[in-house]
Amino acid sequence: MTQDVTSGYSNLDLDLRDNGVCVVTLNRPDKRNALDVATIEELVTFFSTAHRKGVRAVVLTGAGDHFCAGLDLVEHWKADRSADDFMHVCLRWHEAFNKMEYGGVPIIAALRGAVVGGGLELASAAHLRVMDQSTYFALPEGQRGIFTGGGATIRVSDMIGKYRMIDMILTGRVYQGQEAADLGLAQYITEGSSFDKAMELADKIASNLPLTNFAICSAISHMQNMSGLDAAYAEAFVGGIVNTQPAARERLEAFANKTAARVRPNS
């Protein structure tokens, strides 16, 4: 199973652990893990099948000192693409990131260094984001004479608000530290390693039931795009399926018998 999941990749380094946590590392450190066409194709391939191949959670990180510096601008410049060609490049980015957000496998992004342009768009498709003290966020497209093409107008806008996102693109404004976390660019900020914290979260999440995680990571995103009435109906429908699965009944029985772990306040 592990061989099927992790083989055949050049720009991604994959490590599937025994508990179903798969570490996915962007492996272009000399380019600050910039996203070229080949890397996007590998992201599409991996996230298209991860949920069917025993992956229970993903920790997404980057090799070297940076998470991801965004679109490979040198490749884009050398390709001298037509408008039609680049539109289809953007659509492929959307396919990769939609498979991440809606694929049903929880993704925790371990961020450090540059989370810039398309790198921020990539991070925004993860369900949880953990930043360390070196992490900085930017959307420098305005200064480069280009426009976003990987979902910043949707996901980054949802995270921090439309006008903050516009400010980042227009002015190149950089966010980092506690301010970035407070704005919603990351849910966790660590003094130490963002990877270690992401792994801690992934280990905990991987112990959840797969169908429950699938509903949390897929159904909620779909419901956000529905009217309130439709979302309420969908929530009831999904809840009916998830809350009556046999494995859930086993966990409820443990709760009823007082053998399940209790929810306690943070110490």
UniProtKB/Swiss-Prot annotation:
Residues reported to bind 3-(methylsulfanyl)acryloyl-CoA: K31, R32, A69, L71, L73, G118, R144, G149
EC number(s) given by UniProt: 4.2.1.155
Deletion phenotype: Cells lacking this gene do not grow on methylmercaptopropionate (MMPA) as the sole source of carbon. Growth is severely inhibited on dimethylsulphoniopropionate (DMSP).
Catalytic function, reaction form: 3-(methylsulfanyl)acryloyl-CoA + 2 H2O = methanethiol + acetaldehyde + CO2 + CoA; 3-(methylsulfanyl)acryloyl-CoA + H2O = 3-hydroxy-3-(methylsulfanyl)propanoyl-CoA; 3-hydroxy-3-(methylsulfanyl)propanoyl-CoA = 3-oxopropanoyl-CoA + methanethiol; 3-oxopropanoyl-CoA + H2O = 3-oxopropanoate + CoA + H(+)
Keyword NAD: no
Active site (record annotation): E121 (nucleophile), E141 (proton acceptor)
Any GO molecular function: hydro-lyase activity
Source taxon at top rank: Bacteria
Top EC class for this record: lyase
GO biological process, one term: fatty acid beta-oxidation
Keyword Transcription regulation recorded: no
Gene3D superfamilies: 2-enoyl-CoA Hydratase, Chain A, domain 1, Lyase 2-enoyl-coa Hydratase, Chain A, domain 2
Keyword annotations from UniProtKB, A to Z: Lyase
Family annotation (Pfam families): ECH_1 (PF00378)
Result for mutant: E121A: Abolishes catalytic activity
Protein task: Involved in the assimilation of dimethylsulphoniopropionate (DMSP), an important compound in the fixation of carbon in marine phytoplankton, by catalyzing both the hydration and the hydrolysis of 3-(methylthio)acryloyl-CoA (MTA-CoA) to acetaldehyde, CO2, MeSH, and CoA.
Subunit structure, interactors included: Homohexamer; dimer of trimers.
UniProt similarity note: Belongs to the enoyl-CoA hydratase/isomerase family.
Protein name: Methylthioacryloyl-CoA hydratase
Origin organism lineage: Bacteria, Pseudomonadati, Pseudomonadota, Alphaproteobacteria, Rhodobacterales
Gene name in the database record: dmdD
